[in-house]
Amino acid sequence: MAAAKPENLSLVVHGPGDLRLENYPIPEPGPNXVLLKMHSVGICGSDVHYWQHGRIGNFVVKKPMVLGHEASGTXVKVGSLVTHLKPGDRXAXEPGA
């Protein structure tokens, strides 16, 4: 019997007031990507807007969306073209920076 693929428990907004905990498969990093083992993830004001209103300004949640985009973790795998991080390095992610 094949081993089950590892999964990541995620907080997903489906629409205004509709939050669900769902498992998502853990992806393999692409050549320029890094896979982090998450230590903490913040839920910020934009996430609250998506949950309460299903939107922020012109951006409307039209399909399920994983919340939380301010995070810290440890690199477990790095893509073949990544030169600035290695497995074991601690990192923080902030997509707006």
UniProtKB/Swiss-Prot annotation:
Keyword check for Metal-binding? yes
Query: E.C. number, please?
Result: 1.1.1.-, 1.1.1.14, 1.1.1.9
Question: Where can this protein be found?
Answer: Mitochondrion membrane; Cell projection, Cilium, Flagellum
Listed transmembrane segments: none
**Keyword presence, NAD:** yes
Binding site residues for Zn(2+): C44, H69, E70
Extract the Pfam families matched here. ADH_N (PF08240)
**What GO MF annotations does this protein's record show?**
D-xylulose reductase activity; L-iditol 2-dehydrogenase (NAD+) activity; zinc ion binding
- Protein residues bound to substrate: Y50
- Annotated GO CC locations: mitochondrial membrane; motile cilium
Enzyme class at the top of the EC tree: oxidoreductase
Q: Which UniProt keywords apply?
A: Cell projection, Cilium, Flagellum, Membrane, Metal-binding, Mitochondrion, NAD, Oxidoreductase, Zinc
Topology of this chain in the membrane: Peripheral membrane protein
Top-rank taxon, per record: Eukaryota
This enzyme catalyses:
xylitol + NAD(+) = D-xylulose + NADH + H(+); L-iditol + NAD(+) = keto-L-sorbose + NADH + H(+); keto-D-fructose + NADH + H(+) = D-sorbitol + NAD(+)
Gene Ontology annotations of biological process type: flagellated sperm motility
Q: What is its main location?
A: mitochondrion
Give me the comment on cofactor binding.
Binds 1 zinc ion per subunit.
List cofactor names only: Zn(2+)
Kindly state the subunit structure of this protein: Homotetramer.
Task: Please state which protein family the record places this protein in.
Answer: Belongs to the zinc-containing alcohol dehydrogenase family.
Q: What does this protein do?
A: Polyol dehydrogenase that catalyzes the reversible NAD(+)-dependent oxidation of various sugar alcohols. Is active with xylitol, L-iditol and D-sorbitol (D-glucitol) as substrates, leading to the C2-oxidized products D-xylulose, L-sorbose and D-fructose, respectively. Is a key enzyme in the polyol pathway that interconverts glucose and fructose via sorbitol, which constitutes an important alternate route for glucose metabolism. May play a role in sperm motility by using sorbitol as an alternative energy source for sperm motility.
Q: What is this protein called?
A: Sorbitol dehydrogenase
